[in-house]
Amino acid sequence: MTENKSVLKWLDEMKNLLNPSEIMFINGTESQLENLRKLACETGEMIKLNEEKLPGCYLHRTAVNDVARVEDKTYICTPTKEEAGPTNNWKNPEEMYELLYDIARNSYTGKTMYVIPYSMGPIGSPFSKIGIEVTDSIYVVLNMAIMTRVGEKVWHALGQSEDWIRGLHAKCTLSEEKRYICHFPQDNTIISVNSAYGGNVLLGKKCFALRIASYLGQKEGWLAEHMLILGVKNPAGEMKYIAAAFPSACGKTNLAMLIPPEFYRKKGYKVYCLGDDIAWLHIGKDGRLWAINPENGFFGVAPGTNEKSNPNALQTTKTATIFTNVVHNLDDNTVWWEGLDENSPENAINWKGERWNGRVSSEKGAHPNSRFTSPAKNCPCISSHFDELNGVPISAIIFGGRRAQTIPLVYQA
């Protein structure tokens, strides 16, 4: 709980708007999270998987019309269209507040309002930022507890500061027509309605860590980038850190968790992962470029992840992971997805919740955008500097893409 006046004022506004039956403050303790996991299983929001083969792992299915980020319903709401930038969708802030509040009004009736205090970046880092998300989804709470630093320590770090990001998520009716993911940079506010899919509702991820953070960075003199961060150690023990910018589904996670080829391994080269998706970049006091990973976990695409393509990622998913929209193997209560192995289960439930036989079905069992949410600490090659408050110094930046034609990815640097 907090005594921060700006937080309490906003929470009072949210309570009056959403009309919840109960309010629960997420303190991040294992006992509270375990109670929520049990409740999610009781309500059918999650399924507990085989404790021997996948300890602490769960399966969740979204609605079939709610399986990915909705770029066409994602808006930057700034006073002028020019401020939103040429690559974003723009809406008038006043009009959108009115529309969104009308959609969200009383949507928590009979439900619990979960209040999640979270830190993007290590708590106490001068480069970290704090957010507070209210949600009516246990799935969101449990994913945020993996993807960010959550709990009482965040309140202590925030103190009485008014510098924090407001996040409202409401599942509402999951209407596609009334689904909106809106950002109000001038107000430090994010509002997401009528979705329950991770990328739209885990408001610390793209919404905060890239979109709102880009505005904050422009204002404060730093960068929020869609980049992985990895460290490479040579045989002499010298470590160099590299950032790499690729669009989604271009292999950032695979590169971030790279195992050096045998030739280099034998020579003593090692690779360490600091992040697979987002980097916050600052100029340090020494004039070098420094980076932190604002996230605390991996929200990876499951299909195609296997022992050959990314053994470190596969190992990362073996414990304390939430799987979304993959196949449920009923024979041993585990999960499967296309590209995992050749042993597609015959007695299974697909991502839509339908009976599925992988040996004969022409339909894919897992959604192409099915996901795993895993703690960063699970990764076998996670860097010992992952929680470094000042981040790590960047020596090089790689740019990549999947454009068919040959074209320079960098024209000027």
What is each stretch, according to the model?
Residues 2-250, 260-413:
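Conserved internal helical-beta-strand scaffold that buttresses enzyme catalytic cores
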